[in-house]
């Protein structure tokens, strides 16, 4: 029999199969929506199937039972096998296929080349000249060298203008002299910098004839290509264990008057001639392209990690029976409780929303990158602002959702057998890397304040498409409860009203402080909380709109209905979360707020039959999830016991610590009692 849910197999836990039999849509068709087309979804399944047939690519034991050194060795082993066999499994030039391959085999804890493909190659692709790409990019793509991106320092991260590493041009030798003037100038945190990489794209302040030309990027050799030992003038190493992501050797890097050729300055957009003449880039933010690249792709990565945790928690909630709703009936599935649904389902909606918003942002990034190659950087400021806000909101809400998923699993969620704690640790790193979240919101706020200034000066026609709503006329009150089924358009108008009101309020506070004599920087700081609120609301509006646009594009009725239910759940949940802003000026009434609550509870119930299938549609294999609680077959308890028995502590009945310390202590206590 052909089922709509394609994950059903004989012998599965009947409670989980029962959930899957209530699906109202084909999970393969939903996967096509998630991953950008039927071909991409099918390729993911084909890659997963091929990988399952290669035993050398399987973990030798569960990762939680390995030491950090063992994990790094295991990851390097699998990475080497992948490099040898990659071309028979995927198209190495396809970023989506490569990402899935890495997730399946190397997992979320990282690998010795994690930054190589995510930041090093994109930096060379975006900022190196054609000649430089011929020299370095080809070698990087062939994995002849391993590289990373070194920007963050011990003393400064997001504040690029105050980075302390210097690159001073020596006209006599036509070399840049890289130097770390003090301990806070050490590069600190770059992934794979500590032990794996032999090259790095380094960000340093460039000095020519005593003048600081600001931060620029340089291609810097770090280690001897034959011995892998650090080159003279280089101080380099691992910064130690972290909250998660410990297969990655995040490192430190210092320079002692270390010389590199002038031509190691990445020169696609900026140049330094032999005589020290500086040719500036066409746009001030053009060198941000590597970070914007990561922020654009981070969104779908965060959506996947949120979906990992939700898969685990929702499947487990479908097989875990606890308590009774009706005392005359047997114990019920935890998923039957409205509180559990309210804890998980809105985050299922967010995962889809983040995926669709992320896909839209990646398309915009690819458009900007293409235009940059021909010298057009007009959209970079818009993209930088958008990705700053999205990066902040999405990483924060993803962390919230993963933690809710862990707690939804009860005590077993705390075990590494659930693997949710590792997912959480990896995901929340995104709240601080590639820009600390509060600072990211303020970067978007600068864009919003400039837009508000246009509105204030009567130049709303000059607003870009992302902020056009700031100059549009608003309805006097929300019409949410007056349109059948709570029309999505009315919800969007409500979000627009809220975002517009808060943006103009925050901007007016900033403008007012300056008009009253405050210095710009002081006025900005005193307005920053309100400005960040505006940035969050603007970003959440964009996510809602992106979700709605995606649903409107879908032709398959069953898929459209299922995603429309998720969209309705999303807008009601999100609106309840920010309702204070709509109540403050009377745009919404308390009666309308009650209506929104009722709609939320209605859609929790409506989504209930599809909950497991909406997550199965992401089509994660058991190897990718690495979770006993989230197993596809639902056989949790017997495998939880099996997993526990694999603990290295269970290889012996009596631990050396007992023989050495605890047993003598107890014996001494017994003797003293006598």
UniProtKB/Swiss-Prot annotation:
What effect on the protein does mutating residue 301 to E have, as reported in its record?
A: Reduced catalytic activity toward ascaroside asc-C9-CoA, but not toward fatty acyl-CoA substrates. Has a slight activity toward asc-omega-C5-CoA
Q: What is the effect of changing residue 391 to A?
A: Loss of ATP binding and severe reduction in FAD binding
Q: What is the effect of changing residue 396 to G?
A: Loss of ATP and FAD binding. Severe loss of catalytic activity toward ascaroside-CoA and fatty acyl-CoA substrates. Defects in the processing of ascarosides with 13-, 11-, 9-, and 7-carbon side chains. No defect in subcellular location
Binding sites annotated in the UniProt record for FAD:
149-152, 157-158, 191, 320, 340-343, 411, 436
| Domain of life (superkingdom) | Eukaryota
Q: What is the effect of changing residue 340 to A?
A: Loss of ATP and FAD binding
Q: One Pfam family from the UniProt entry?
A: Acyl-CoA_ox_N
TM segment ranges: none
Has keyword Lipid metabolism? yes
Q: What is its main location?
A: other
According to the record, what induces this protein's expression? Induced by high temperatures (25 degrees Celsius).
The role this protein plays is:
Involved in the first step of peroxisomal beta-oxidation by catalyzing the desaturation of fatty acid-derived side chains. Specifically, catalyzes the desaturation of fatty acids heptanoyl-CoA (C7), nonanoyl-CoA (C9), dodecanoyl-CoA (C12) and to a lesser extent pentanoyl-CoA (C5) and hexadecanoyl-CoA (C16), and hydroxylated fatty acid hydroxynonanoyl-CoA. Also, catalyzes the desaturation fatty acid-derived side chains of ascaroside pheromones, which regulates development and behavior.
- Kindly state the subunit structure of this protein: Homodimer. Forms a heterodimer with acox-1.2. Forms a heterodimer with acox-1.3; the interaction may be important for the stability of acox-1.3.
Specify the protein name.
Acyl-coenzyme A oxidase acox-1.1
Cite the source lineage. Answer: Eukaryota, Metazoa, Ecdysozoa, Nematoda, Chromadorea
């Amino acid at each position: 029999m052909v089922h709509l849910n394609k994950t059903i197999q004989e012998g599965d836990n009947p409670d989980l199969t029962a959930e899957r039999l209530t699906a109202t849509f084909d999970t393969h068709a939903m996967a096509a929506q998630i991953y950008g087309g039927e071909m991409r979804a099918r390729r993911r399944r084909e890659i997963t199937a091929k990988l399952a047939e290669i035993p050398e690519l399987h973990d030798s034991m569960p990762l939680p039972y390995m030491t950090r050194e063992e994990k790094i060795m295991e990851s390097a082993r699998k990475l080497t096998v992948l490099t040898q066999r990659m071309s028979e499994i995927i198209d190495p030039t396809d970023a989506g296929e490569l990402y899935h391959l890495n997730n399946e085999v190397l997992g979320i804890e990282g690998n010795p080349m994690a930054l190589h493909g995510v930041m090093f190659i994109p930096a060379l692709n975006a900022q190196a000249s054609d000649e430089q790409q011929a020299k370095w990019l080809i070698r990087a793509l062939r994995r002849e060298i391993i590289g990373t991106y070194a920007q963050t320092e011990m003393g400064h991260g997001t504040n690029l203008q105050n980075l302390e590493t210097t690159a001073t041009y020596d006209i006599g030798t036509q070399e840049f002299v890289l130097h770390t003037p003090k301990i806070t100038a050490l590069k600190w945190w770059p992934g794979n910098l500590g032990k794996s990489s032999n090259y790095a794209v380094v960000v340093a302040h460039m000095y020519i004839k005593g003048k600081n030309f600001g931060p620029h990027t340089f291609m810097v050799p770090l280690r001897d290509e034959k011995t892998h030992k650090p080159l003279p003038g280089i101080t380099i190493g691992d910064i130690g264990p972290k909250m998660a992501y410990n297969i990655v050797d995040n490192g430190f890097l210092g320079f002692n008057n270390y010389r590199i050729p002038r031509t190691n300055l990445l020169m696609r957009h900026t140049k330094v001639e032999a005589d020290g003449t500086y040719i500036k880039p066409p746009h001030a933010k053009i060198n941000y392209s590597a970070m914007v690249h990561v922020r654009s792709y981070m969104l779908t990565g965060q959506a996947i990690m949120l979906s990992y945790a939700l898969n685990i928690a929702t499947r487990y909630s479908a097989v875990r029976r606890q308590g009774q709703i009706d005392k005359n009936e047997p114990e019920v599935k935890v998923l039957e409780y409205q509180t559990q649904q309210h804890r998980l389902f809105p985050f299922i909606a967010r995962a889809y929303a983040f995926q669709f918003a992320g896909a839209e942002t990646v398309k915009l990034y690819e458009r900007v990158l293409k235009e940059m190659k021909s010298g057009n950087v007009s959209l970079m400021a818009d993209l930088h602002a958008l990705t700053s806000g999205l990066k902040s909101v999405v990483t924060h809400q993803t962390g919230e959702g993963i933690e809710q998923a862990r707690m939804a699993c009860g005590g077993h969620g705390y075990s590494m057998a659930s693997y949710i704690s590792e997912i959480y640790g990896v995901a929340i790193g995104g709240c601080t890397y590639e820009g600390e979240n509060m600072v990211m919101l303020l970067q978007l706020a600068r864009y919003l304040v400039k837009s508000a200034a246009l509105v204030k000066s009567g130049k709303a026609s000059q607003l870009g498409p992302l902020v056009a709503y700031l100059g549009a006329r608003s309805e006097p009150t929300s019409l949410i409860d007056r349109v059948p089924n709570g029309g999505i358009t009315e919800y969007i108008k409500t979000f627009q009203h809220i975002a517009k009101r808060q943006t103009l309020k925050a901007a007016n506070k900033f403008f007012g402080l300056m008009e009253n004599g405050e210095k710009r920087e002081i006025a900005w700081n005193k307005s920053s909380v309100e400005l960040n609120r505006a940035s969050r609301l603007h970003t959440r509006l964009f996510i809602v709109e992106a979700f709605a646009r995606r649903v409107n594009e879908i032709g398959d009725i069953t898929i459209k209905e299922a995603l429309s239910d998720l969209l309705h759940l999303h807008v009601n949940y999100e609106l309840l979360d920010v309702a204070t802003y709509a109540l403050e000026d009377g745009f919404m009434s308390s009666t309308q707020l009650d209506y929104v609550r009722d709609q939320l509870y209605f859609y929790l119930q409506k989504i209930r039959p599809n909950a497991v299938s909406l997550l199965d549609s992401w089509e994660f294999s058991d190897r990718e999830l690495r979770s006993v609680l989230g197993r596809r077959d639902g056989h949790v308890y017997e495998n939880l016991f099996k997993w526990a028995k694999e603990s290295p502590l269970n290889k012996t009945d009596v631990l050396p610590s007992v023989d050495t310390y605890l047993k003598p202590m107890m014996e001494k206590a017994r003797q003293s009692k006598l």
